[in-house]
UniProtKB/Swiss-Prot annotation:
GO terms (BP aspect): DNA repair; DNA replication, removal of RNA primer
Cofactor: Mg(2+)
GO MF: 5'-3' exonuclease activity; 5'-flap endonuclease activity; DNA binding; magnesium ion binding
Family assignment from sequence similarity: Belongs to the XPG/RAD2 endonuclease family. FEN1 subfamily.
Region annotation (N-domain) ranges: 1-102
EC number: 3.1.-.-
Biological source species: Pyrobaculum arsenaticum (strain DSM 13514 / JCM 11321 / PZ6)
Keywords in alphabetical order: DNA damage, DNA repair, DNA replication, Endonuclease, Exonuclease, Hydrolase, Magnesium, Metal-binding, Nuclease
Binding site for Mg(2+) 1: D31, D84, E156, E158
Protein name: Flap endonuclease 1
Chain intervals for the UniProt region annotation (I-domain): 120-261
Gene transcribed to yield this protein: fen
């Protein structure tokens, strides 16, 4: 879900829209779960239901991952997908709340379909999205067959992706959420795993990749350090404390950080006596020192055409002609990445 309130404070001066091709020659660590949820939400049939194979298994995530990854590689981008591992204990309550909300949305979806309320079907279908273990394994299998590297994070995927970017093994983190900045990524690229067009109300708007640099964010918000950015996010709400501090909006939160300098000082003064479901200092410590692994590679490998055909066409009923055309595109794009000076990739 991410730190959406913090995103509202990040102004245009800290954001830079670019063409996809401007990222050519860059390695980007993509938040795999974030991307898969986007594919499940956006790749749907006219009635709002996801794509499925003949066995009734959802394939929207497979389709989105396959074709979008090829698009990124054709633009010269080297993607590395990072998958979530075990969430921190203090996130479990929030995960349970999300599960209940999805179950409720599923009930509303069934009711809307039965009653023929087609205008509401798409709305509830998106809210009812579940990312199952089978879907995650499908994604990993597909990437392996494509020759695209993926990394299993020990905990939060964005924490691992940010770690890889901090070490210089990737140039940026790719996600719609802002959490990677809190985890220390030097830069975030948004709108990478999305369709270049999105419907907003009755209009279709173009979505360009958007680069947000950590240093630019700190400068624009007049913050001295990443620690202060974390403090600000905790006041506003994160994945671990989505409600933030009741009664404190973005502008007041920013002023409090300017005035008191740290979350700890606020807890000793203005916020003394406030009850928190989760210790905010524990959340801060997690952002500063999350579990990460050094066991990963960013190297691309040769695609396995036979396994891709079997997985996509025979197992999941993708159209054979379209898959063959995509395989040719993949091989050409992969060839450029593998024969270019790979040391130019971070």
């Amino acid at each position: 879900m991410g730190v959406t309130e913090l995103g509202k404070l990040i102004g245009k001066e800290a954001r830079r829209e670019v063409k996809l091709e401007a990222l050519a020659g860059r390695c980007v660590a993509l938040d795999a779960y974030n991307a898969l949820y986007q594919f499940l939400a956006s790749i749907r049939q006219p009635d709002g239901t996801p794509l499925m194979d003949r066995a009734g298994r959802i394939t929207s995530h497979i389709s989105g991952l396959f074709y979008r990854t090829i698009n990124l590689m054709e633009a010269g981008i080297k993607p590395v997908y990072v998958f979530d591992g075990k969430p921190p204990e203090f996130k479990l309550a929030e995960i349970e709340e999300r599960r209940k909300a999805k179950e409720k949305a599923t009930e509303e979806l069934v009711r809307a379909i039965k009653e023929g309320r087609r205008d509401e079907v798409a709305k509830y279908a998106k809210r009812a999205i579940f990312l199952t273990n089978e879907m995650v394994e499908d994604a990993k299998k597909l990437l392996t067959y494509m020759g695209v590297p993926w990394v299993q994070a020990p905990s939060e995927g964005e924490a691992q992706a940010a770690y890889m970017a901090r070490r210089g093994h990737c140039w940026a983190v790719g996600s719609q959420d802002y959490d990677s900045l809190l985890f220390g990524s030097p830069r975030l690229v948004r709108n990478l795993a999305t369709s270049p067009k999105r419907k907003v109300g009755d209009e279709v708007v173009e979505l360009s990749p958007e680069i947000i640099e950590l240093d630019a964010v700190l400068k624009s918000l007049r913050l001295r350090s990443r620690e202060q950015l974390i403090d600000l996010a905790i006041l506003l709400g994160t994945d671990y404390n989505p409600d933030g501090v009741p009664g404190i909006g973005p502008q007041r939160a920013l002023k409090l950080i300017w005035e008191f300098g740290s979350l700890e000082k606020l807890l000793d003064t203005v916020l003394r006596g406030v009850t928190f479901p989760i210790d905010p200092v524990e959340i801060k410590r997690f952002f500063l020192n999350p579990p990460v692994t050094d066991t990963y590679t960013t190297d691309v490998t040769k695609p396995d055409d036979a396994k891709l055909r079997d997985f996509l066409v025979h197992e999941h009923d993708f159209g054979e002609e379209r898959v063959e055309r995509a395989l040719e595109r993949l091989k050409k794009a992969m060839g450029k990445l593998r024969t270019s000076a790979l040391d130019s990739f971070f």
